[in-house]
């Protein structure tokens, strides 16, 4: 027991001191800061190989989009549409991820705190207008639609099979909400060693502070956080309006 405690304290002290215990070399993406300063990331140049990249637009369904304030909803959809237009111009694979349930919600366990409330709401039921993707960012021929039953894009779907079959190794993703589908998908994809980019101004959350903390403090450890303008520049999109 004492040995376990000593090891635990040792690892804790190393973590707090910023010491690297994972054997990375000098080109690691994290620098140990001088005393009294905040750790900073060293981001590589943001580049995209269209043949190896997929764009994931997640949970842009009417029932979800309509929960956002109008002053957020309109600009968000406009930016999302611009991103998709640029991605199609650059011939990137676009994948829509949607959350839908059968009538009566047989997929929802009452112990699932996130989804159990849906049974009373009537939202996101297959075949209803609310479960459809917003017409302003509707899929086009060649796009793929993946249906999920839980928060993340990988859980309960065949997304991983699709990505592997297309030899996709980089994901550019955005969605609603930041603390829901985006967070869940980033965590899962990072653990599977995908290269990740998050388009920050095409994500939204009902709590702006949660959105800010995730974008500024959490996601940069596992993904490159970019704006829609930076993404379009990286893919060489021209005359996108």
Regions found by a protein language model. Give the residues of each.
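…and closely analogous acidic/polar surface helices at protein-protein or active-site interfaces
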Residues: 68-87
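Active-site-adjacent betaalpha module
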Residues: 22-54, 82-90, 114-241
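Short, flexible, mixed-charge acidic loops at enzyme active sites
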Residues: 107-114
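Active-site loop/turn elements of alpha/beta-hydrolase fold enzymes
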Residues: 60, 99-101, 201
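Short acidic, Gly/Ser-rich segments with clustered Asp/Glu that frequently serve as metal-coordination loops
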Residues: 62-66
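Von Willebrand factor
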Residues: 86-107
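Bacterial N-terminal signal peptides
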Residues: 8-18
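Bacterial N-terminal signal peptides that target proteins for export
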Residues: 1-8
């Amino acid at each position: 027991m004492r040995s376990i405690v000593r090891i635990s304290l040792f690892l804790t002290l190393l973590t707090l001191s910023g010491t690297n215990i994972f054997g990375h070399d000098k080109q690691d993406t994290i620098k140990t800061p001088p005393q009294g300063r905040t750790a900073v990331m060293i981001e590589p140049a943001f580049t995209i190989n269209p043949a190896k990249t997929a764009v994931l637009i997640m949970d842009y369904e009417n029932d979800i989009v309509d929960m956002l304030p109008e002053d957020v909803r309109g600009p968000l959809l406009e930016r999302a549409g611009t991103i998709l237009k640029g991605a199609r111009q650059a011939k990137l694979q676009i994948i829509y991820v949607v959350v839908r349930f059968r009538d009566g919600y047989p997929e929802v366990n009452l112990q699932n705190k996130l989804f159990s409330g849906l049974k009373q709401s009537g939202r996101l039921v297959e075949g209803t207008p609310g479960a459809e993707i917003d017409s302003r960012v509707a899929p086009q021929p060649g796009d793929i639609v993946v249906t999920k039953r839980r928060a993340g894009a990988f859980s309960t779907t065949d997304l991983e099979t699709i990505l592997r079959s297309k030899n996709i190794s980089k994901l550019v993703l955005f969605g609603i909400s930041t603390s829901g589908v985006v967070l869940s998908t980033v965590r899962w994809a990072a653990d599977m060693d995908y290269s990740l980019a998050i388009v920050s101004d095409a994500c939204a959350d009902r709590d702006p502070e949660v959105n800010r903390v995730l974008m500024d403090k959490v996601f940069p450890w596992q993904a490159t956080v970019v704006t829609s303008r930076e993404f379009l520049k990286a893919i060489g999109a021209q005359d996108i309006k």
